[in-house]
Amino acid sequence: MRPLLGLLLVFAGCTFALYLLSTRLPRGRRLGSTEEAGGRSLWFPSDLAELRELSEVLREYRKEHQAYVFLLFCGAYLYKQGFAIPGSSFLNVLAGALFGPWLGLLLCCVLTSVGATCCYLLSSIFGKQLVVSYFPDKVALLQRKVEENRNSLFFFLLFLRLFPMTPNWFLNLSAPILNIPIVQFFFSVLIGLIPYNFICVQTGSILSTLTSLDALFSWDTVFKLLAIAMVALIPGTLIKKFSQKHLQLNETSTANHIHSRKDT
């Protein structure tokens, strides 16, 4: 009971801090009053329409308060990652629209790693018993696979990020239970999710330049998106070839879980 209470207190404190950060915006002619800033526009987007609206608002506000927008984005991203809340793909796309393709990619890779590590630590301190109680079969499966590949653990972790047998949020929660060293965990997230982050950020960068829906289906945009997808496939192909030679993988289990949702 104490671990659950402690987790709820941490969650409540972080939620309140993020609320203050999003409602105590410095005034500026671009964003009107703080009430307007703290309303519907500055909340987690749930679809592409809300995402586009939010990106337009923040891009205008960023012209006067660049540091504050950066801080707000980082806080929101770490909040989602730290508490294993699905939907970080929208924030990756938003990063591409706000910060450009390369700065956005660097930022998302770092925030994904730091946020996932925060989730690791929260699970280690408060959530081990809860995770084992609610997901005993999934934990047992991962435990068996981790032990089978202990000698090549880092590459196995990369494989799990690129070809998930289980959702990323669950891997973040269960990692301390599986005795995965935190340093290996951090760098496996940093490297393993580069292709996924790359696709999302580059897509956001492209979408932010479009002036109409028709432009989304232009040949130029289609070719750019295809090129992004091809580049992102290269690391996955290399890791998969290495895994087939050096890792102990159950192909049946992998096939059954390969379509797990890739939320971090």
From Swiss-Prot:
Glycosylation sites recorded in the entry for this protein: N250
Transmembrane segments: 67-87, 100-122, 153-173, 175-195, 219-239
Membrane topology: Multi-pass membrane protein
Organism in which the protein naturally occurs: Homo sapiens
Keywords: Glycoprotein, Membrane, Signal, Transmembrane, Transmembrane helix
Keyword Membrane assigned: yes
Domain text: The VTT domain was previously called the SNARE-assoc domain. As there is no evidence that this domain associates with SNARE proteins, it was renamed as VMP1, TMEM41, and TVP38 (VTT) domain.
InterPro entries: TM41A/B, VTT_dom
Pfam family, one: VTT_dom
Family: Belongs to the TMEM41 family.
Region of interest called VTT domain, as start-end residue ranges on this chain: 96-207
Annotated signal peptide: 1-17
Disulfide cross-links: none
GO terms for cellular component: membrane
Subcellular location: Membrane
Chief localisation class: membrane
The protein's name: Transmembrane protein 41A
